[in-house]
Amino acid sequence: MATRNLVASLLCIMYAVHAMNDYLYIVKHVKVCNHDYENYCLNNGTCFTIALDNVSITPFCVCRINYEGSRCQFINLVTY
C-alpha cells in the first residue's frame, strides 16, 4: 500500500509541478505498460509502470470513472 501512496504522490507532483526538475525526473520514470502487463488493469483501466529504483518496475492503474482499486477491480456506485 505504501507503494501505491508513493505513486499517487508522484503523479500529483507530476501534474502540479510541471515546470520543475522533479517533473522531468518523474516523467522519465513513468511509462505506459508494455505487453507484459497487458491485462493488469481491469475495466478498461490504463496501466502505467514506474521505476522506483534501478531494478524495480512497479505497475499501477489509472481507473476510468466509477471504478477504483489497485487494479480497477471495484465499481463505485456513489454519484456526486
Curated annotation (Swiss-Prot):
Annotated localization: Secreted
Record GO cellular component, one term: extracellular region
Location of the EGF-like domain: 29-73
PROSITE patterns associated with the record: EGF_1 (PS00022), EGF_3 (PS50026)
UniProt-listed InterPro entries: EGF-like_dom
Glycan-bearing residues: 44, 54
Molecular function terms from GO: growth factor activity
Keyword Disulfide bond: yes
Domain of life: Viruses
Signal peptide feature range: 1-19
Disulphide bridges, residue numbers: 33-47, 41-61, 63-72
Principal subcellular localization: secreted
Keyword field: Disulfide bond, EGF-like domain, Glycoprotein, Growth factor, Secreted, Signal
Keyword Nucleotide-binding recorded: no
Organism: Rabbit fibroma virus (strain Kasza)
Protein name: Growth factor
